[in-house]
Amino acid sequence: MEPLGLILVAVALGTDAFSLATGLALGGFRGRQAWLFAGTVGLFHIFMPLAGLYLGLLLGRLLGKVAAIIGALVLATMGTLMLWEAYNNRRQGGSMVGQVLRVIPGRGGVLGGVMAILFMAGSVSLDALSVGFGLGAISVNVPLTVLTMGFIAATMTALGLLAGRRLGSFFGNRAELAGGLILVAIGLKMLVGV
């Protein structure tokens, strides 16, 4: 995968984290916890795709060209699911942020502190496992790929936290839509190239 494609995949994966961080900042999530959250999201976006990449590489060795087709379909499917979720959230007026805010300490949630941060970081990193699997099936530069994904996810999370108070919910749903479109486009491009 060329560098631009890798960056686009990483940005697409970071849109969930950006949206969540924007909403968390609107809900009063600030200070040390906010920066710990950004770093944790970055780490999750390194280790989740890493696990997926190794599973994908194993599948690639076993199945050859079929694995590349499966990888492309996984990316396109993840993008389609992101689009579907964004569409449903827009129709119902809800968002992932609203569901997750209840776990923040002081907001009546069950989880607190580090557990809440781990839960939220994991929830926005699950897509990275599947995307890592898809990328592993086409043999990519593993260290470069996971470090790029982690850095971009942490950066997008930090930007979401910084911009949250000013931007409101304007970018939240739109970012998820853009991320879904990017993943679908890259998956289709990979599929055509197989």
Swiss-Prot record:
Top-level taxon: Bacteria
Gene Ontology cellular component list: plasma membrane
Subcellular localization: Cell membrane
Keyword check for Glycoprotein: no
Topological type in the membrane: Multi-pass membrane protein
InterPro entries the UniProt entry points to: Mntp/YtaF (IPR003810), Put_MntP (IPR022929)
Keyword Transmembrane helix: yes
One Pfam family in the UniProt entry: Mntp
Protein name: Putative manganese efflux pump MntP
Source organism: Moorella thermoacetica (strain ATCC 39073 / JCM 9320)
